[in-house]
Amino acid sequence: MNLFRKKVKEWVYSFSTEDHYAEYNSNDQFNMGMRSQGASHHDVEAHAQSANDNILSMEDDIDLDSMDGTPSEGVSEVLLAWRHIDTWTSEYNPDLNATLSDPCTANDIKHAEEDLEVVLPKALKASYRIHDGQEDLESMTGTSGLIYGLQLMTLDEIVAMTQRWRSVADKLNKQATMSKHSSVGVSNGSSMGSTASIGSSSQQQREKPRNKFKLPYIPEQKSIPPETVLPLYAHAMWIPVLTDNAGNHIGIDLSPARLGKHGQVIMFGRDFDTKYVVAENWGDFLLSFANDLEAGNWLLVDDSDDYLAGEGELVFRDKKSNGPIQDYLEVLKKRSWNKYQEQLRTNQETMQSGEPTLTSTRTHKKTSSFELDDDFDHTTTTTEHNGNEFIESSVPETNSDIPQIVKKEELDETAEETKEESNELDVKTEEIAPESTQIIEETPETKEEEVSEQPEEAVAEVTVDANIEEPEQQVEEQEVLLENEVTDSVNNADANTEAVPEVEEKKTEIETETPAEPIEEEEESTNVEAPQVEEEEDSTTAEPAETVSKSKKKKNKKKNKKKNKANQDDNVNELSHDFETVQL
């Protein structure tokens, strides 16, 4: 008798309720969605109004306040998307519109959440309060899935498919656990003995056929963008919503990775070792599909000869490029990849704009310090100073005012060379025996020119040797070297001026004793060289000429010393000027 009453109540319940997923139970709490095995539960106001094809009245029937506790992102996008989808399907493909089911009730959604032990996002709840997926696809030939061939599953199918993928995830977890235990058992067996190892291996062989999964191995799992989806083949918190009836799905991710977002829409399945994030929420995904329909990115393909089969299957084709028909899953993959690449470019641009430029860092080094940097390439530049060229080494774009540092040994060598050359000139002038006053008067000029040219040549040698790569020395060494050079040059000048009073006294004595005699002219040019003067010395043998030559020799020596002193003073002035510029 009780069984008969139960059947009658179930029959009455089926006619009096709008629930699709919820079933009759004699317990009133069960029918009101108060199951004990669910996750977090909230009081739900059951809606008893009849389904209506008008979306406006359906929006009023949806009670969003009953969906507290879940993110509300995407709800308005869902309502807007379904307006366009219903309008388009009723106009261009009525048979496809006829496959859309009536809305499910809040009690259905609550029972599904309790069975899955999850809390669905508000956007998905609002979508199923408008249409509970598609039905009667097999009975209606010439139709396909709503989303370019992808079928929108009913709430009952979603629960069943989720349970299947959870069983797959459980098997994979068991395999991973067994592999860990087997590796531990092998390591322990090596220490325990051969008998225990043989027994464990035989037990593993018996359990292996029972726990073996269909796939021989699981490839490496990835995601686009990286670290947005967990790198797993299957997960218990991935809720499939669309299916291609071949093991691939578009669903809701309720357990994202570190960079993911709760409720994001992902692609996963048997053909997707790389998971793709196609939208941030279900409302954005539905709205993108509606935009494709409004943009004309669609075709209706009818391969059947049956004229009563309907308008055909809905497929994707890009209207702008007028390209071929494309699989919508591949289109979504491409869009996800392009969005990821665009995000990378944006991040690179922001990073480049935030980093200081190379020019600014080099300018900062120039203004803050006076040190040479070994990391920069060194070049040489020439500047004019008092008629002489000084070759300076400078760093491009930075230390262009720093002169080249010269070693102390090089300066000492050049000073010794100039001193030796001046001594040689003095010796040559002593050996000269002039025969005429013209020679005596012209030779000092030639010697003056030679002596004046010697410091310039020495300076040129210094500047040439300055090209040696010595950029690492500090400016302080240069200051010390320049001071030493100045002191050496001053000491040489003082030594040359000591013999001037004695020469003047001897000159006056000789001039009073011996009168000067006329001397014949032998050369017309002023640039008299040393070998020619030596030949003239052989031709002068007279004794009076010897006395005259001694007086003139002293006179010439005096003039040469004066010229040398003047030239050395000029060099000292130039070096002191350089020293002042370096100090500045």
Swiss-Prot record:
Region named Disordered: 176-210, 346-584
Polar residues composition-biased segments: 346-361
GO biological process: fungal-type cell wall beta-glucan biosynthetic process; regulation of fungal-type cell wall biogenesis; regulation of mitotic cell cycle
Compositional bias (Acidic residues): 447-459, 467-486, 511-540
Database matches in Gene3D superfamilies: SMI1/KNR4-like
SMART domains named among the record's database cross-references: SMI1_KNR4 (SM00860)
Origin superkingdom: Eukaryota
InterPro entries: Knr4/Smi1, Knr4/Smi1-like_dom, Knr4/Smi1-like_sf, KNR4/SMI1_regulator
One Gene Ontology cellular component annotation held by this UniProt entry: cellular bud neck
Basic residues biased stretches: 550-565
Extent of Low complexity compositional bias: 182-204
Family recorded in the similarity comment: Belongs to the KNR4/SMI1 family.
Protein name: KNR4/SMI1 homolog
